[in-house]
């Protein structure tokens, strides 16, 4: 992140993004656990670990968004509310990237706002959790 296709994903690094999300979480008074992986199995295990440990999740499944039934099944099993976030507008990209296997399970989807989408997603998730 920060170097791959900056015209699509921007120049913010993963560390920049984490710092911004942690700052937003602090201002909202919520605890945050940060997790990143490039491995589908590790992603599934992280989702499964949410049960009983988290009230909600902010998720960017990257390319797994379009392909992973395993991650979808993990979210179906844990029933933890989540917001799906994407740096780019996946719905305006090439056809293979326009379909999300997670969107219908998410409480909402935020796409195309770059790093700001994470703060938007976190605020929306906290608001939704406050309605329960």
Residue spans for each PLM region:
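Glycine-rich phosphate/diphosphate-binding loop of Rossmann-like nucleotide-binding domains
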Residues: 1-28
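Short beta->alpha junction loops
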Residues: 31-41
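Short, glycine-/small-residue-rich phosphate/pyrophosphate-handling segment
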Residues: 33-34, 92-132
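Short acidic active-site motifs
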Residues: 42-46
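Short acidic/histidine-rich motifs immediately flanking catalytic phosphotransfer sites
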Residues: 50-57
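Short glycine-rich anion-binding loops that position phosphate/pyrophosphate groups of nucleotides
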Residues: 62-65, 88-90
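Short Gly/Thr/Asp-enriched flexible loops that form oxyanion-binding sites at enzyme active sites
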Residues: 68-77
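Short, acidic/small-residue loops that bind anionic groups at enzyme active sites
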Residues: 76-93
């Amino acid at each position: 992140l920060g170097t791959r296709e900056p015209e699509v994903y921007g120049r913010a690094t993963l560390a920049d993004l984490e710092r911004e999300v942690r700052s937003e979480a602090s201002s909202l008074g919520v605890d945050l656990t940060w997790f990143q992986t490039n491995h589908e199995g590790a992603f599934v295990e992280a989702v499964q670990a949410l049960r009983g440990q988290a009230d909600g999740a902010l998720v960017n499944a990257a390319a797994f968004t379009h392909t992973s039934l395993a991650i979808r099944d993990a979210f179906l099993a844990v029933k933890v509310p989540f917001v799906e976030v994407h740096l780019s507008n996946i719905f305006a990209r090439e056809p293979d990237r326009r379909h999300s296997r997670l969107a219908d399970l998410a409480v909402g989807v935020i796409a195309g706002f770059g790093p700001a989408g994470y703060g938007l997603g976190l605020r929306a998730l906290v608001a939704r959790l406050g309605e329960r």
